[in-house]
């Protein structure tokens, strides 16, 4: 097995681990955002929109990174098929 192949397998493993961690963080942010923007709150002035906005911005960053990682993982997996 050549060195490049071993390095690519390492990149694949790292990418999968990073994807898993970011996916968990994204899921947690979705739960947090839903709690901050409670649809059952009758007084909309009590909604914590600033906190939700910051969380949404982070979620947007995570989703972009997750999409890029997913593409990278697919390409690496295709290489090893």
Label every model-predicted segment.
Residues 1, 8, 17, 42-45, ...:
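Generic cytosolic/nucleocytoplasmic N-terminal low-complexity/intrinsically disordered segments
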Residues 1-27, 57:
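Short, charge/polar-rich alpha-helical segments
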Residues 3, 41-42, 79-81:
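A short, terminal or domain-edge coil/loop segment
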Residues 20, 24-56:
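Short E/K-rich amphipathic alpha-helical oligomerization segments
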Residues 51-63, 67:
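Acidic, serine/threonine/proline-rich low-complexity intrinsically disordered regions
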Residues 64-81:
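Long amphipathic alpha-helical coiled-coil segments
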